[in-house]
Swiss-Prot record:
Keyword Transport: yes
UniProt keywords, alphabetically: Cytoplasm, Nucleus, Transport
SMART domains registered for this protein in UniProt: UBQ
Subunit and partners: Component of the bag6/bat3 complex.
MF annotations from Gene Ontology: protein-folding chaperone binding
Pfam families found in the cross-reference section: Tugs, ubiquitin
Transmembrane stretches, start-end: none
GO biological process entries: post-translational protein targeting to endoplasmic reticulum membrane; tail-anchored membrane protein insertion into ER membrane
Reported function: As part of a cytosolic protein quality control complex, the bag6/bat3 complex, maintains misfolded and hydrophobic patches-containing proteins in a soluble state and participates in their proper delivery to the endoplasmic reticulum or alternatively can promote their sorting to the proteasome where they undergo degradation. The bag6/bat3 complex is involved in the post-translational delivery of tail-anchored/type II transmembrane proteins to the endoplasmic reticulum membrane.
Keyword Ribonucleoprotein found: no
Coarse class of the protein's main subcellular location: cytoplasm
One cellular-component annotation, GO: BAT3 complex
Organism placement in taxonomy: Eukaryota, Metazoa, Chordata, Craniata, Vertebrata
Native species: Esox lucius (Northern pike)
Protein name: Ubiquitin-like protein 4A
Amino acid sequence: MILTVKPLQGKECNVQVTEDEKVSTVKELVSERLNIPPNQQRLLYKGKALADEHRLSDYSIGPEAKLNLVVRPAGERSGVTGMASSNSAVGGVWQTLSTVLAKHFSPADAAKVQEQLIKDYERSLRQLSLDDIERLAVRLLHPDSEGMDTSYLD
């Protein structure tokens, strides 16, 4: 089947694949055609992000489908966006969560659940005040300082 891949800004390309191909394979083909490294690509189908380890058939992607391509800046990690992407430990958590969700949900439902969890996590981080961050930093940097007067932080 032929898929059309359209970057948000730029020229679209067509790739020949089977429905059993993994998303990562599609990214490799797009990389060859558009000279965009796979780790900078985020493919979307009907507004939903596609996970590299899933097959096109998992998302019911058929012939003549159109995928949107978002190109990430060179330094940004793949997998999650925003603040979570800058921390490799958090990236590992999302990968582990993805594996667990895949065991209990359909690929589409697992993607929805994970997407909502990531949004909730990032919203929680954005809502932290500077005082919250300072308290957290003191507790992390001085875990054994129970005798230390930190009342000024509360």
